[in-house]
UniProtKB/Swiss-Prot annotation:
Its main location: cytoplasm. Coiled coil: none annotated. It comes from Mycolicibacterium smegmatis (strain ATCC 700084 / mc(2)155) (Mycobacterium smegmatis). Residues 25-51 are annotated as: Disordered. The keyword Plastid does not apply. It is found in: Cytoplasm. Belongs to the SepF family. HAMAP family: SepF. Keywords: Cell cycle, Cell division, Cytoplasm, Septation. Cell division protein that is part of the divisome complex and is recruited early to the Z-ring. Probably stimulates Z-ring formation, perhaps through the cross-linking of FtsZ protofilaments. Its function overlaps with FtsA. This is Cell division protein SepF.
Amino acid sequence: MSTLHKVKAYFGMAPMDDYEDEYYEDDDRGARAGGYSRRPREDRFEEEAYGYEGHEYDEGPAYRGGYAERFADEPRFEGRMRAPREFDRPAPARLGAMRGSTRGALAMDPRGMAELFEAGSPLAKITTLRPKDYSEARTIGERFRDGTPVIMDLVSMDNADAKRLVDFAAGLAFALRGSFDKVATKVFLLSPADVDVTAEERRRIAEAGFYSYR
C-alpha cells in the first residue's frame, strides 16, 4: 500500500482494511504454511521493538489435589490415648499392704480393749449382734433381758429395717430400765439396768472398734 493511501486511511479518507491487512500479511503466510493463527498487532509491535519472545510466567507451586496429599508433609497427630509406658504403670500393691490395720474410729486399740473389757468390768460379757433384717430383733431382746450388754451393728441393714429395729431396742431399754446409746453411725449400745456405761466408755468403745471385731 502506497504512502498516499496510508495518509488517506489515517484521516478517514480511505478504508482501513487495506491498512490493517499489511500488518497481518506475515502472520497469514505463517498460518497458511505452519497452521497457526494470526496474533494481535500489539504483540507483534512489542516483539519487533523490544525483542520480546513471548509471554513467560513463573511456575507457581504445583497443585496438590486431595486432602491426604495436602497434609502429607505435616507431622501426624499423635492421639491422646496411648499405651502406658512401663514407668507410667503404678506398681501393684502388695497383699500385705492391702490387709493393713483399720485406722480412725474403727481402729482396734488392744490396750484400750483390755482396760474396757477386763475381768470384773461391767462390759466384760458384752456381745455384738449384726442383724440382717428385722426378724432378728428377738435375739437382741433375749440377750438384753438376760442382763448382757448388746452392741447392735446395723450397718448391713437397709434404712427402713434399721429404723424399726432402733425403735424396738429403744422401747426395750425403756421397759427394762436400761439405757440405749449411739456408739457410731448405725451402731448402738443396749445396756441393762445394772450396767452403767459412761460417755467416756462409749467413746472408747467407738475408738477401739470393739463392735467390729467381737
